[in-house]
Amino acid sequence: LVIDATHPYAQVVTANIRKACEKFPHICLLRCLRKESEDEAKDSKGDKNGIIHVKNTAEAVRYLSEKEGNIFLTTGSKELVLWQGLPGHLERIFARVLPVEASVHICRELGYSGRHIIAMQGPFSAEMNYIQLKEFQCSYMVTKDGGDTGGFKEKMQAAKKAGATAVVIDRPKDKGMSLEQTKEAVKEWMKDVSE
C-alpha cells in the first residue's frame, strides 16, 4: 500500500509515485488530497472581495503585468524565474521563500537582494502576513491554496485587512480522495490483506 499525501502542487512528485507504483501491479496506490480552502465567491470578473483566481504562475504574471504596485510573493523560489517577465520585477516583488541556502541562492541568481528576499519558515499567522504586506507596501499577495495546513485562510485574512488583492494560483486538477475516504480505504485494504 502506498499513500500519496504530497502537497497539492507537487505534481512531479505525484507523477513519479504513480510511475513507480505502475511497475508493481500488486501495489495499491491511494491519492489523498488536502481539503481545499473555502474563500469568498467570485463575481463574473473573478475579482469579488479582492480575490483573483488564476490557473498557473504564468497567468498570474500576465495579470500582474497590467497592474501597478508591489507584490508579496508567497509561493517560494521554485517558479520565481517565471516572474522575470514582469515589468519592474526586481523592485516590485518581495519573495517569501524557505530559509535554506538553495532558496536564497535562487533569489540571488535571479537578481533579488536585501529586503526583497524574505527567508522564513511558515505557515504564518494572519498578523504576520498582514505585517509583511504593510511593511513592503504590497498591493497584491500571490499565493497557492495550500489548505488550512498551508495557512491559506490566514493569508486571505491578512490580504483583506491590508486592502491587498489576493492572486490565488488554483490547484492543479487531480483525482483522489479526502482524508476521511483515505482512512476508510486503508481500513478496507487492511481487512483484505489480513484475510
PLM features: residue spans?
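Structural motif
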Residues: 1, 70, 139-140
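Glycine/small-residue-rich loop that forms an oxyanion/phosphate-binding "nest" at active or ligand-binding sites
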Residues: 1-60
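Short hydrophobic alpha-helical runs that function as membrane-insertion/retention elements
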Residues: 3, 30-31, 142-143, 166-170
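A short helix->loop->beta-strand "cap" motif at the edges of active sites that frequently abuts
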Residues: 22-29, 91, 161-165
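Short acidic-hydrophobic, aromatic-tinged amphipathic segments that line or gate anion-handling sites
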Residues: 49-57, 178-188
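Anionic-ligand binding region
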Residues: 69-70, 74-116
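Short, flexible loop segments at boundaries between secondary-structure elements
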Residues: 100-103, 166-177
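A C-terminal functional module that forms or caps the active site or interfaces directly
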Residues: 108-131, 135-136, 140-162, 171
